[in-house]
Amino acid sequence: MKKNILLLLIVFFSIAACKKDEPIYEINQLQSNSYNANKNKLKSASQYISILYANLFQKALSPNELVEITRCIESVGDKGLVHEVVLSNFMNKEGVIIPSDSLMRADLDLFIEETYKRFYVRDITEAEREYFLNFFASHPDVSSEMVYMAFSLSNEYQFY
């Protein structure tokens, strides 16, 4: 009787122990960061102005103008409003380098890529590309000047 129970236990445990191994897939761990995760420092007024001027005119702003505009920005409490006014003044000056609307519409993909690199100093994500292509398709009245203004006033542009 003991032998039968012992034999039964051995058979039971050997059957229970025989299990097909599940395949193990090795996965490489990747560190995923947001596209702008490292942009966490707010630009100072002089940094914002000099970078904005360089992005719009493709040349450096004179030190005298930089000091004058920086003092103007620092004297006003609403930074968003003053940034809009300064940007508007820059856009009305001669020498702003903006692609024409017809050139923008001719190759939207290239325009969007270059705008991201110019203002955000990074590559565009596929989701952003798809969004802008759909946006331009549904809004034919949007000009390249409007796009440049939107990028210049965006939250991401305020940080480095």
Stretches with model-predicted labels:
Residues 11-12, 147:
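Intrinsic disorder/low-structure terminal segments
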Residues 14-17:
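C-terminal motif of bacterial Sec signal peptides marking the signal peptidase cleavage site
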Residues 19-160:
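Substrate/cofactor-recognition hotspot
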Residues 1-4:
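Positively charged n-region of N-terminal signal peptides that target proteins for export
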Residues 6-9:
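Sec-dependent N-terminal signal peptides
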